[in-house]
Amino acid sequence: MTSATPQPGQLIVITGPSGVGKGTLLRQLRQRHPELALSVSATTRPPRPTEVAGVDYYFVSVEEFKAMIAAGQLLEWAEFAGHYYGTPRQPLVQLIAQGKTVILEIELQGARQVRQSYPQARHIFILPPSLAELEHRLRSRGQDSEEAIARRLAQAETEIAAAPEFDVQIVNDDLEKSLIALETAIFSPAP
């Protein structure tokens, strides 16, 4: 009797402006679907109060991050809001080879890199109902300076303009509706 080879998994790339609610959607999604694997990104930004190293991000120094780039250890990487973010390649590849559906939450530049290096990934863009609502969400987090909020809003306009590049766009105006749309996008057969 031979053991079955696991079927390859899939990579789901989720992108959207800062403050659009990606984290909230993904937390809810993982509660409903614990079988989904979340890719853990590396970043040079400091941890937020509720974040756990190795779970939410791998928090590394700029020097460590640059060494990862030089060694080809990142599937994608980008600089955003003054910090580096990137996806360690090996853990992601291992999970997909094990048949897992892996969720990769990254920003636009990284998503574009993944489209080039891993074209079979499904790309989902989360949109805010409006820029005014996005600004409200950013301010209500209470963690960014006025300058950072202005930078994030300017970046959001650029990112929103790129939404048509994605396989699926979801407007996050109602958590439950958005979650159902996200589930549909992830679990429906690829077109």
Swiss-Prot record:
E.C. designation(s): 2.7.4.8
Domain Guanylate kinase-like span(s) in chain numbering: 9-187
Family matches, as InterPro entries: GK/Ca_channel_bsu, Guanylate_kin-like_dom, Guanylate_kinase, Guanylate_kinase_CS, P-loop_NTPase
Top EC class of this enzyme: transferase
Membrane-crossing segments per the record: none
Pfam family, one: Guanylate_kin
A GO term, aspect molecular function: ATP binding
Subcellular localization, as worded in the UniProt entry: Cytoplasm
PROSITE patterns assigned: GUANYLATE_KINASE_1, GUANYLATE_KINASE_2
List of residues binding ATP: 16-23
Primary localization: cytoplasm
Keywords: ATP-binding, Cytoplasm, Kinase, Nucleotide-binding, Transferase
Reaction equations catalysed: GMP + ATP = GDP + ADP
GO annotation, cellular component aspect: cytosol
Family membership: Belongs to the guanylate kinase family.
Biological role: Essential for recycling GMP and indirectly, cGMP.
Protein name: Guanylate kinase
Species assigned in the record: Thermosynechococcus vestitus (strain NIES-2133 / IAM M-273 / BP-1)
GN (gene name): gmk
